[in-house]
């Protein structure tokens, strides 16, 4: 059986597949198991997940013996015990019965590379990470680093040691193969690595100078000189600027660590997966910030990503957020995925709190999709309603008021994952990834990072797509017949190289050949070849494009907090149609052809996105103007559900004999209270004459926090999780006297910032868990405002 994760995806767009996306493209979800109860009722839980649009589950057994302090786990099942394997088999059977695929974590906990502690049980101190601790008699004396890379209480194996890499293959991959049996592409199609590192959070690459056995000899063999004379200066944190010779030694040292990590850890896992028809995937540590690349402990980011069939990222602690930054970092992974013809994944929302409103969910997914991500494994699902296991949020689960809406969010994600995997990406610009300057230290490091950040931001702000290329990509590049730089599956006519002193000579030679072949090389400027043009500058408009056998698909995203109102100019000969990811619909759209360019009015609300497909079948629709007929101001409301904590369980209560009362359209925190989490039903009435009932009408709710369900005269109009909160009114549902009802549900932020809950945090969670909760509390308080804010307008199309 072929593993679909290892196959190239379809080249053509199919309307039926967009409407009902294949299970392959549906998002997965982490399935944390922190207690034995989480293993109960799996079939029911998996059926519910599938009904919500989930296609994969990633079971994550986290034993109390290693992680109680950090997660509150009470799970008495350790890795590589009969109970552990039985639990995985039970999960697999339930997933198969529900039609879900299983992603297998390569670690019971995190970070990867420990085999649940079995690695160090086998190798002892010799296999622990070591740091250089020179003595008077031994300048290369190395001592075990007793603290862990993420969990300080647990030492980390030395992932530069070839024996450790071999042991991981044996104690993790072969163990899973032996215990799970069957066809690996069926029972274990995707092995997920979570933050393997030879560094770690808080690791100072100078103060904690990583060393592995025989490194000095490998260094001499690799570079032809000894590192020992340079060590005093290399390991001195007070040395702000190094001599050129010492900086070269520093570059060579970090390059050697990168090579050892690739050769001794990543490559054996990748090759095992190749032999066994399994996709290797996952993400590294701190890949979102170039200033922390060396702390992340993965050597060279792009080179390491090449050793994943599905390179990926995660975005935790609001690293991607509309009120913080619109950064390019997903492109580190997606560049390698494009160049190798592979898929690219993301694990968003970890430890980002219940402040992940539906609108922020969409913004984050859009942010990563438009940068090349096309498979998702979001954090947040909790199989357990016990409050003790909700320390790392967001929380999506059957007990939350938004769960009944999540199929809209997950299917939105799936449709775009499918759509943006069709065909090939349109990308003609490559940006040099200068890892060697980062390794060199100051003054080169900061200059390289600032240049990369500035150029990448300018490219995004001017609607250019781009990929990163590094020294290895340049050295292995070829040239097309018309002189383009060919890197794997991608071809580039423009190469941007910020000023650098550290590009490898062999890469420099390729650049010169590219120039001789007619290629464009820029240093501190960007090309003027955007994917589309606009009649006014739009620095917060992001665009990507897919070419699908003569058709073009554009994904346009307003990442800003202000509306966009412009005209988009496309270099296309066909007319566009609009694809709607929320519903799978295809709608005609107004556009004009002028002098070989398609002009399309483009109005996007903050965080709104648009899919435009250019195809022979498309026809331009007439311009539709709208006039506001009336504003609906007289409202009543009542509570229909309330989510509370009872006996340490998150529970939903349904009030009895609850009558409608007059209500203003305002934050219900002011009327019901800050702590209220649940659903409120709003009701209003309006009249239409017989002539008016023959018109086309839309109801626009204005501002809603956070999600809503709308019905007219008992007929469900639909559900929305983000703006625009507008609904077409079907003619058959209209009456002379009409009753409009709007159910609004909010996030769990209000529950988790309630006075009662916060007063118990220190007794509910471990010290580390409580620390996390205090971080999340600040963000959750920012998203307390809830309800129907309006203005609600009844709009007639003319």
What are these model-predicted stretches?
Residues 3-9, 21-28, 32, 39-44, ...:
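Carbohydrate-binding surfaces of carbohydrate-active enzymes
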Residues 13, 46, 50, 54-57:
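N-terminal regions that are enriched for targeting/export leaders
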Residues 94, 111-182:
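Catalytic and substrate-binding clefts that recognize carbohydrates or anionic sugar/phosphate headgroups
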Residues 568, 686-713, 721, 740-744:
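Aromatic-lined ligand-binding clefts that engage carbohydrates, nucleic acids, or primary amines
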Residues 618-619, 745-754:
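Short acidic/polar inter-strand loop motif in beta-rich domains
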Residues 662-676, 680, 759-798:
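Non-catalytic, glycine-rich low-complexity segments
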Residues 687-689, 727-737, 748:
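Short, surface-exposed tryptophan/glycine-enriched loops
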Residues 717-727:
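Aromatic-rich membrane-interfacial microdomains
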């Amino acid at each position: 059986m072929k593993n679909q994760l290892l196959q190239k995806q379809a080249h053509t767009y199919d309307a039926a597949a967009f409407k009902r996306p294949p299970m392959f493209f549906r998002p997965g979800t982490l399935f944390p198991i922190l207690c034995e109860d989480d293993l109960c009722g799996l079939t029911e839980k998996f059926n519910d997940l599938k009904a919500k649009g989930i296609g994969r589950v990633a079971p994550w057994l986290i034993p109390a013996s290693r992680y109680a302090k950090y997660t509150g786990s009470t799970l008495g099942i350790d890795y590589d015990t009969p109970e552990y394997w039985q639990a995985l088999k039970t999960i697999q059977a339930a997933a198969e019965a529900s039609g879900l695929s299983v992603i297998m974590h390569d670690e019971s906990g995190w970070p990867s590379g420990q085999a649940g502690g079995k690695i160090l049980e086998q190798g002892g101190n010799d296999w622990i990470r070591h740091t250089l601790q020179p003595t008077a008699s031994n300048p290369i004396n190395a001592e075990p680093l007793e603290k862990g890379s993420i969990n300080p209480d647990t030492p980390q194996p030395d992932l530069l040691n070839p024996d450790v890499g071999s042991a991981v293959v044996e104690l993790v991959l072969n163990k899973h193969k032996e215990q799970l049996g069957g066809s690996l592409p069926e029972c274990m199609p995707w092995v997920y690595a979570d933050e393997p590192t030879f560094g770690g959070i808080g690791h100072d690459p100078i103060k904690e100078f990583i060393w592995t056995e025989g490194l000095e000899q490998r260094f001499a063999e690799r570079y032809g000189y000894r590192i020992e004379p340079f060590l005093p200066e290399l390991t001195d944190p007070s040395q702000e600027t190094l001599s050129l010779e010492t900086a070269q030694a520093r570059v060579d040292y970090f390059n050697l660590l990168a090579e050892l990590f690739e050769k001794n850890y990543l490559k054996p896992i990748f090759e095992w997966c190749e032999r066994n028809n399994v996709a290797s995937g996952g993400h590294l540590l701190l890949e979102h910030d170039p200033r922390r690349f060396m702390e992340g402990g993965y050597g060279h980011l792009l080179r390491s990503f090449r050793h994943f069939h599905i390179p990926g990222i995660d975005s935790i602690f609001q690293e991607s957020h509309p009120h913080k930054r619109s950064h390019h970092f997903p492109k580190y992974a997606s560049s390698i995925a494009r160049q190798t013809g592979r898929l690219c994944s993301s694990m968003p929302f970890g430890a980002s709190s219940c402040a992940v409103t539906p609108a922020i969910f969409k913004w984050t997914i859009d942010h990563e999709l438009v940068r090349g991500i096309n498979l998702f494994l979001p954090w947040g699902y909790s199989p357990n309603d016990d409050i003790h296991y909700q320390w790392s949020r967001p929380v999506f689960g059957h007990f939350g008021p938004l769960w009944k809406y999540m199929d809209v969010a997950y299917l939105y994600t799936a449709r775009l994952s499918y759509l943006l995997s069709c065909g090939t990406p349109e990308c003609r610009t490559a940006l040099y990834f200068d890892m060697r300057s980062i390794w060199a230290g100051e003054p080169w490091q900061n200059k390289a990072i600032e240049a990369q950040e500035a150029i990448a931001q300018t490219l995004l702000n001017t609607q250019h797509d781009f990929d990163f290329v590094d020294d290895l990509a340049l050295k292995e590049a070829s040239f097309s017949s018309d002189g383009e730089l060919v890197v794997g599956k991608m071809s580039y006519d423009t190469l941007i190289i910020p000023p650098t002193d550290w590009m490898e000579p062999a890469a420099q030679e390729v650049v010169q050949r590219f120039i001789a072949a007619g290629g464009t090389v820029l240093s501190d400027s960007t090309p003027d070849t955007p994917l589309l043009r606009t009649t006014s500058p739009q620095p917060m408009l992001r665009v990507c494009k897919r070419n699908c056998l003569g058709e073009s698909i554009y994904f346009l995203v307003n990442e800003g907090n202000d509306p966009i109102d412009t005209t988009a100019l496309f270099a296309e000969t066909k007319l566009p149609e609009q694809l709607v990811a929320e519903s799978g619909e295809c709608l005609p759209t107004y556009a004009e052809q002028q002098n070989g360019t398609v002009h399309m009015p483009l109005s996007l609300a903050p965080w709104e996105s648009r899919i435009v497909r250019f195809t022979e079948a498309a026809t331009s629709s007439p311009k539709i103007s709208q006039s506001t007929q009336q504003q609906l101001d007289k409202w009543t409301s009542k509570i229909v559900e309330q989510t509370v904590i009872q006996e340490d369980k998150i529970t939903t209560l349904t009030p009895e004999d609850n009558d409608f009362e007059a209500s203003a359209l305002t934050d219900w925190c002011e009327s019901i209270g800050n702590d209220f989490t649940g659903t409120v039903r709003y009701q209003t009435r309006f009249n239409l004459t017989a002539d008016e009932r023959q018109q086309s009408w839309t109801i626009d709710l204005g501002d809603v926090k956070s999600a809503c369900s709308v019905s007219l005269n008992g007929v469900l109009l639909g559900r929305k999780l983000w703006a625009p909160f507008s609904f077409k009114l079907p003619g058959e549902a209209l009456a002379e006297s009409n009753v409009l009802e709007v159910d609004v549900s909010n996030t769990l932020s209000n529950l988790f910032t309630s006075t009662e809950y916060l007063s118990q945090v220190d007794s509910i969670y471990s010290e580390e868990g409580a620390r996390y909760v205090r971080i999340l509390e600040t963000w959750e308080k920012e998203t307390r405002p809830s309800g129907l804010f309006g203005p609600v307008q009844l709009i007639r199309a003319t």
